[in-house]
Regions:
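Charge-dense, helix-prone N-terminal extensions
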Residues: 1-115
Length: 115
């Protein structure tokens, strides 16, 4: 994925948000088969299907993760059940500290659902 495509989607975000996006993508791309798919207003992280969406905000990165059930954590700000066995879980990433083992565990689980 070209950095310029990522930077285009996040052009209106503060520079630290672009740094967060690049750091998160670098970690996620260590998983097998991950493709970063730029859309008009966001980025999708795909394996066979999308397992996460990265949405720009001025001061933060809004991450939407797929899961089998709602993720129970105070970090999750919104959960939407999209089918009997799938939920979308929304959280804000405002600093590099938020890209931690807990978050990566959720991403690994979402990645497995997209196999």
């Amino acid at each position: 994925m070209a950095a310029s495509a990522i930077d285009r989607v996040f052009a209106r975000s503060d520079s630290h948000v672009r740094t967060l996006v690049h750091a998160l993508i670098e970690r996620v791309q260590r998983l097998p088969g991950v493709v970063v798919d730029p859309k008009g207003t966001c980025l999708h992280l795909n394996r066979r299907t999308a397992f996460a969406g990265l949405h720009p905000r001025r001061n933060a990165l809004l991450l939407n993760l797929r899961s089998k059930a709602p993720i129970e954590s105070p970090r999750i700000r919104k959960v939407e059940r999209v089918s009997a066995n799938r939920c979308h879980n929304e959280l804000l990433i405002e600093s590099a500290d938020a890209i931690d083992d807990e978050l990566m565990g959720w991403i690994v689980e979402a990645h497995a659902l997209a196999a």
